[in-house]
């Protein structure tokens, strides 16, 4: 199943090579993850979330699919109230990360720093509070720094 045109140009394959190597139980889920990752890189977050969600159906143990959902919600400056919080998705990724590569575990742990139940519960889209706490953003940035170096 493809949730988007199969000829969609995601740019240079080197931009999303990481996506082709994620820990995943089957190739159908991996192919959908690559599609989701491409949409994520192109800021097509709603389509990326739909594709990452399909990955969780194809492989419920794919921690990086849950990470992808949380990442799309947390990095989306055009956040829509219907997208919700990334807290529950990243907690699902945390619960599944044991079988992941070290890099995947580090990415999951870093993004988990950006979400809290308190921020999720305090979100109020009517006043543009999307549960995106500045202190949590700093914690995420600090957790990502060693991965960049």
What are these regions (language model features)?
Residues 121-149:
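Asp-box/WD-like beta-propeller blade repeats and closely related beta-sheet repeat scaffolds
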Residues 28, 62-63, 100:
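Residue-level recognition of tetratricopeptide repeat
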Residues 38-47, 69-101, 109-130:
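Inter-helical turn/loop elements of alpha-helical hairpins
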Residues 1-27:
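N-terminal pre-domain segments of enzymes
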Residues 54-57, 95, 149:
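Conserved structural position within tetratricopeptide repeats
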């Amino acid at each position: 199943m493809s949730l988007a045109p199969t000829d969609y140009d995601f740019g240079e394959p080197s931009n999303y090579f990481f996506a082709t190597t994620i820990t995943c139980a089957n190739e159908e889920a991996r192919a959908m993850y690559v599609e989701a990752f491409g949409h994520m890189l192109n800021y097509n977050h709603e389509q990326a979330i739909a594709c990452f969600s399909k990955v969780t159906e194809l492989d419920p143990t794919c921690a990086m699919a849950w990470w992808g959902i949380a990442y799309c919600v947390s990095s989306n400056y055009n956040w829509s109230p219907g997208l919700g919080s990334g807290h529950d998705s990243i907690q699902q990724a945390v619960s599944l990360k044991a079988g992941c590569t070290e890099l995947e575990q580090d990415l999951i742990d870093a993004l988990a720093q950006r979400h809290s139940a308190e921020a999720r519960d305090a979100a109020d889209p009517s006043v543009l509070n999307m549960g995106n706490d500045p202190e949590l953003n700093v914690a995420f940035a600090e957790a990502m720094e060693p991965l960049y170096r």
